[in-house]
Amino acid sequence: MSAGALNSAGAVMHSTRLRTNEVAVALPEEGDASLFFVGKIRTPWKSRSDTPRQGSELGPLCTLEISEPWAVALKGVEAYSRLEILYWLHESPRDIVLLSPADDGEIHGAFSLRAPVRPNPIGTSIVKVERVSGNSIVVRGLDCLDGTPLLDIKPDRSLSKPLAPVRKSFSIPAA
């Protein structure tokens, strides 16, 4: 799917046909959040069709290039073996809210999928850290295009916080 032009809200206007039963909405002109790109992600993938659906810790080496003045925030990151990476899926349409990911007419809401097509196209991956060098972190496990804007880096929360136990049952109290 090719990217379209940006509207005044910085949203990609969907430039290809919608799939059967998909629905797009008009986007608001202004947002209420301001994000800073802290760097750029370097990967081997130049097109969405080449990009894996999900990253793998066995995948190719990718590099997180941290821009100034944010590079100083890397202090201590080398202590972690895995990081959670948040990035802006800059070529994803933002106006499609009902999607048919398999192009089979079956519809799902954007919030019920991990697809890159969503109102706020924020991607997230848990990556394996290979090395930290200067303003760069070399990792494995990404699934985004080369040049993707980097939003944030966090230690993988599952390394420091125990996972919640699985509930054996769930019931709604009687009214």
UniProtKB/Swiss-Prot annotation:
InterPro entries associated with the record:
TrmO-like_N, UPF0066_cons_site, YaeB-like, YaeB-like_sf, YaeB_N_sf
Q: Does the keyword S-adenosyl-L-methionine apply?
A: yes
This protein's record includes keyword Kinase: no
Q: Which PROSITE patterns match?
A: TSAA_1 (PS01318), TSAA_2 (PS51668)
Q: What sequence ranges are listed for the domain TsaA-like?
A: 35-165
Q: Which Gene3D superfamilies match?
A: YaeB-like
Instruction: Identify the residues that bind S-adenosyl-L-methionine.
Output: P52, R53, Q54, H90, E91, R114, T124, L145, D146, G147, T148
Under CDD domains, the record lists: UPF0066
What domain of life does the native source organism fall in?
A: Bacteria
Keywords, in A-Z order: Plasmid, S-adenosyl-L-methionine
One Pfam entry name: TrmO_N
Q: Which family does it belong to?
A: Belongs to the tRNA methyltransferase O family.
Q: What is this protein called?
A: Probable S-adenosyl-L-methionine-binding protein VirR
To which species is this protein native? Answer: Rhizobium radiobacter (Agrobacterium tumefaciens)
